[in-house]
């Protein structure tokens, strides 16, 4: 008898001496953290690096609560307000290079984000086009196998084409809206520059008048007023001249409000009626006050302020003759030239000396007429013979 059999009989339970079990498979390593998306704005310090903006200035901007995302979403006017607040609250001397450097950094970051977004969009659109082409190929293959095309496939393709056409039209409308917004902002900035030039040199105040008064291909402006006597109320849809002069008084009140708000916020306050005043008037609901209309009749208001009796007599005469407001407007130049002759043909000094006219720019046409009158007066004086005694 085998001794192993005897041991097995004595010990029925016995360890299995087979091959060892395989070692447990170690768990897979955790995936690496996802890289930060490339289309997320960088930190403010990284954004302005290399553009000449001091770190102390960046710290002050951060203390005001501005981040890179906030600055990228701000307009040019809001950036100006932020810089004015930085100079007003912290008394911080913001260098000129820092102002331009910050704007350049924001433009570069916007361009980077737009390029990344366009690349990502192009990749998605490319994959979509590939999928669509594969679907079309498979449908053509099925159609070739079946010998024709079903009505369901035709209807599905028509619906898909309509959806794509709607998406394309929506994208075009969005581009047009963005382009119009940029054009309006550029035009607004150009008008502000024209106002600055008017404050420096006093010229160019009748650019709208010259463009509307004739010449070129501009449409003749329709006069919204009729000639009325003092105290007369106009009928129909047009207004009288008393209402016109009242608009200039309203502009003066709007200028005072803009000046008080500018002083309250520590901004530069305008000394004359500029685009800022017209924008404020539109903002508070006085949309009937606009720059072309007020600049067009400013010399008529000047005659009303300087010599009210002559202005009233002129109104009565033109009302009796049935003249329109355009002829009355042209007739208002001659009395003003006579008034300037008493002050050496210096019409700017005449405007500056009157409290209600000092806030208005002298019309270019009126200044030219005064200059011509001064030249003709000097030529006539030179042609006179010298006195005999």
Curated annotation (Swiss-Prot):
Compartments in which it is found: Nucleus
Coiled coil: none
Compositional bias (Acidic residues): 190-201
Site (Interaction with DNA): 268, 275, 279, 326
Chief location bin: nucleus
An example Gene Ontology CC term for this record: nucleus
One annotated GO molecular function: DNA binding
Protein family per UniProt: Belongs to the FLO/LFY family.
Functional summary from the UniProt entry: Probable transcription factor.
Protein name per UniProt: Probable transcription factor FL
Lineage of source species: Eukaryota, Viridiplantae, Streptophyta, Embryophyta, Tracheophyta
